[in-house]
């Protein structure tokens, strides 16, 4: 099954209590798998039905979050899920003992172009998992946040490889969240 190191296990445990769950680190360091596993654990009990998974492209999201070389959502929920369409959107549809036989839908979308946000409009999402968030267009990031306003258990799981310290993902989001967290405003 899964053989996580202590640092990875501690991060996954902490995700239960945090709205924002963000991992930055080297390529192949396990960031995405940690977030996928934490996301899957929350998916089992969240009251929200529809969730969002994004990558720079839809293919990237499906490979890194859905498959993840045998560690993705389709493997965690094997025998309880199938790939398909949900309201014309690419989705992993989950329903089985892990979700107490309540249907959970994870919509997959690409996020790198300026009009990617149009694909996720019209839905409300509970949780959002994004891989390589630094490659997402700002329009999509803003729209994904807006689409979570009605969530019963709002959670965000992001991963990224290190970028230039002045990159927009830091200036517009990560540095802002860090400052708010230090002030107790998150």
Question: Residue ranges of each PLM-predicted region?
Answer:
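Phosphate/NTP-binding elements of NTP-utilizing enzymes
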Residues: 1-186
């Amino acid at each position: 099954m899964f053989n996580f190191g202590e640092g990875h296990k501690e991060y996954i445990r902490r995700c239960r209590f945090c709205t924002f769950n963000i991992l930055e680190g080297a390529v192949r360091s396990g960031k995405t798998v940690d977030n996928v596993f934490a996301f899957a654990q929350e998916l089992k009990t969240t009251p929200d039905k529809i969730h969002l998974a994004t990558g720079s492209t839809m293919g990237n999201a499906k490979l890194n979050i859905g498959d993840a070389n045998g560690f993705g959502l389709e493997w965690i929920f094997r025998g309880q899920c199938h790939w398909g369409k949900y309201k014309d959107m690419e989705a992993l549809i989950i329903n089985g003992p892990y979700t107490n036989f309540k249907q959970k839908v994870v919509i997959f979308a690409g996020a790198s172009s300026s009009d990617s946000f149009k694909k996720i409009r019209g839905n409300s999402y509970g949780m959002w998992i994004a891989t390589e968030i630094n490659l997402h267009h700002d329009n999509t990031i803003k729209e994904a946040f807006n689409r979570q306003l009605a969530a019963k258990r709002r959670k965000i799981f992001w991963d990224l490889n290190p970028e230039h310290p002045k990159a927009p993902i830091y200036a517009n989001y990560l540095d802002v969240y860090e400052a708010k967290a230090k002030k107790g405003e998150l």
